[in-house]
Regions:
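Hydrophobic alpha-helical positions that pack around
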Residues: 76, 81-184, 190-195, 204-205
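Ferredoxin-type iron-sulfur electron-transfer modules in oxidoreductases and energy-metabolism complexes
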Residues: 227-249, 259, 264-343
């Protein structure tokens, strides 16, 4: 069975973000760079960092397999230079194996892990507006995805477990492996985490979403962060969307900070969040409104840039939904893109972001405790944990599974 079919059969999807099926990225021509994304730019999450430090052999072997299968000219593991243990472990593994894979050490800025930002950093090329990395000859997989690729190919293992970080307002932050489908509330109770009358974020403080304790862990869950209600990391997420849209119409002072610091604007894309905010009283046909489709939803605008604490991110998400209903798709007349000159000095240092969001008191290592010690009495498996059509179950009600 070829690599693509193995990954499809074993259910390997992007372990972070939208869960793009990994097999669908594997073209056998036109790939110059195969990039492993180890930046893990969301504060308080340690999954990728811990996997690289503890399992460098799996990461390196999986990347080598995918490089060989696709015929990629170059394979790169991109991670922040400050991840000293991960850098040391990967360097040692590459020295031992002699594989033609390079490490690319990135600065400590947000969002270093955005795949289009990473492609520019590694290759010097800008992914076109509305495009994906393959448009400039690059493929990007995150570190846990590579861990699962190794399991699928070398161990015949399907993706039935997920690494997650438990952090925020907890006594002992931890990174661990749990069965997919584990109920969040059961897991937090098992770990002795107090989450009553608090907010649970699925993901990081920037791009994560508020979830209910009855929700299950999925293949794309990167972490569970616990915060007190009203904390700066969750206040905008808790706000009603109608209130956010109203404030966008009446409270935006057009300072343009959201635009000047927007990662996609700095890539050279035609995205100006400040003009979208200014256009909120107009129709969907307004040309600035359509720019919302270029937003990567990193949250830098709402968490760091806006002095009014408005949320261009959530405004853009709401606009995207309306444009999708209208069947609108973004098209660009430009063929070549270059990053804006100001990009080099407008990168936002992650430490400043942590201070702005009042995360410093929670910024403690969440070391990996390996082992299959989390054994829930039952799991709830959503059929749609990825981009594309829902999965089709191979078992029926009443079947015994192991």
């Amino acid at each position: 069975m070829e690599v693509r079919e193995i990954l499809r059969e074993k259910g390997v999807v992007g372990a972070g973000g939208a869960g793009f099926p990994t097999y669908a990225k594997l073209k056998e021509e036109g790939i110059d760079y195969y990039i492993a994304n180890g930046a893990e730019c969301e504060p308080l999450l340690d999954v990728s960092k811990e996997i690289m430090a503890r399992f460098p052999d799996r990461v390196v072997k999986a990347l080598s397999i995918l490089k060989d299968f696709t015929g990629a000219k170059s394979a790169v593991i991109a991670l922040k230079g400050k991840y000293k243990q991960a850098v040391k472990a990967l360097d040692a593994e590459l020295l031992k194996t002699g594989l033609d894979i390079k490490l690319f050490e990135m600065g400590d800025f947000f969002p270093a892990g955005d795949e289009q930002v990473m492609v520019l950093e590694v290759t010097g090329k800008v992914v076109p507006e509305g495009g994906i990395p393959i448009a400039v000859g690059a493929v990007v997989n995150n570190i846990e995805t590579l861990y699962n690729v190794y399991g699928a190919i070398e161990e015949d293992s399907p993706v039935i477990q997920k690494f997650i970080t438990i952090g925020g307002q907890v006594k002992n932050p931890i990174t661990l492996k749990v069965p997919v489908g584990t109920t969040i509330g059961w897991l937090l109770d098992f770990l002795g985490v107090d989450y009553k009358d608090k907010v649970i974020i699925d993901g990081g403080p920037m791009m994560g979403n508020i979830v209910d304790s009855n929700s299950p862990i999925t293949k794309t869950t990167g972490g569970l962060l616990i915060f007190p209600k009203g904390h700066p990391a969750v206040s905008v997420k808790e706000s009603d969307i109608n209130r956010i849209l109203k404030l966008a119409r009446i409270a935006c002072i057009q300072c343009r900070y959201c635009t000047l610091q927007c990662p996609r604007y700095l890539l050279g894309h035609d995205l100006e969040p400040s003009k979208i905010m200014l256009s909120m009283g107009f129709k969907l046909s307004d040309r600035y409104i359509k720019q919302a489709l270029l937003c990567c939803e990193c949250g830098l605008c709402e968490a760091y840039s806006c002095p009014q604490r408005l949320s261009p991110r959530r405004v853009n998400i709401a606009i995207k939904k309306e444009l999708a209903k209208a069947g609108f798709k973004y098209t660009t007349g430009k063929a070549d893109f270059s990053p804006r000159e100001a990009r080099q000095w407008r990168k936002i240092f992650t430490g400043r972001l942590k201070i702005r969001l009042q995360l410093m008191e929670f910024d403690r290592p969440a070391l990996l405790v390996d082992g299959d010690f989390v054994k829930p009495p039952e799991v709830h498996i959503p059929m749609k944990q990825h981009i594309g059509a829902p999965a089709i179950p191979l078992v029926s009600s009443g079947d015994k599974v192991t």
